[in-house]
Amino acid sequence: MPAQAYAGKECVCQLRRGICDQSCVQGMLDTPFYIACLKLTGRRCLVVGGGEIGLEKVEGLLACDGEVTLIAPHAHETLVAYAREGSIRWEQREYGGAADLEGVFMVIAATDDTDVNIAVFADAERQAMLVNVVDVPPLCNFILPAIVRTGPLAIAISTAGASPALAKRMKREIEGQFGAPYARLAVLLNEVRGWAKGTLPTYQERKEFFEGIVNGDPDPVELLRSGEGAEGTGEQAVRELIAQAQSAHALQVSRA
């Protein structure tokens, strides 16, 4: 939805001249966003709007174990199915104001009604709540990057709201470059985090241990990549690489 639709209606850039000169959108490009990963497990997340975009946002929240409530008089058939199976709670009605946000951690407005979107944003802002109005950067205090996700590996791509289409293109390109070998390496390294904390007494020693493996020769990513489909030969080679690093660092600690 274009930013012009919000002119004179509490637009965050405070332009009430009958038109919006896009200053509010430009301001998003200059905003130094703080990038973080949110743990949504057990947290109430609200989506207002039950169309295709609402479905996309609901599925993203469900993928992160959010407790999702949908408010919409009508909903996409897939959302209806989610409600019937108990995956989400669907309140089949219009947005009712600030009371709908009670106990909510995050709200996403995905309607085609300008007034509803403005109301959701204003109500959430007054409660210092995370709020995103889809495709209207001025009415967001957080934005949703495109995500490349493989196993425990997640890569976020953001254009600060300037071009979601560009972010999606970058996502496709990154998916081809960083895939299963990187995700598998993350799992293998996680397996020895406990050993590292129990054996290597300082942060610097643990840092050198892990960085030595990740940036070492032979390259563990290339070992995993070359061993894909070869009865786990790549993974076995990386396990041996890690074991060698463990022995070397444990020896250094014993001599200290």
Segments from the language model and where they lie:
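An accessory alpha-helical subdomain
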Residues: 161-256
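ADP-ribose/adenylate-binding Rossmann-like module
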Residues: 106-112, 117-144
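Conserved SAM/SAH-binding loop
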Residues: 93-97
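Residue-level detector of alpha-helix initiation sites
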Residues: 52-53, 114-115, 161
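Hydrophobic beta-strand scaffold residues
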Residues: 68, 90, 130-131
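Hydrophobic, well-ordered beta-alpha structural blocks that scaffold small-molecule cofactor pockets
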Residues: 11-82
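A short, aliphatic-rich alpha-helical micro-motif
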Residues: 40, 98-102
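Short acidic/histidine-rich motifs immediately flanking catalytic phosphotransfer sites
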Residues: 86, 101-106
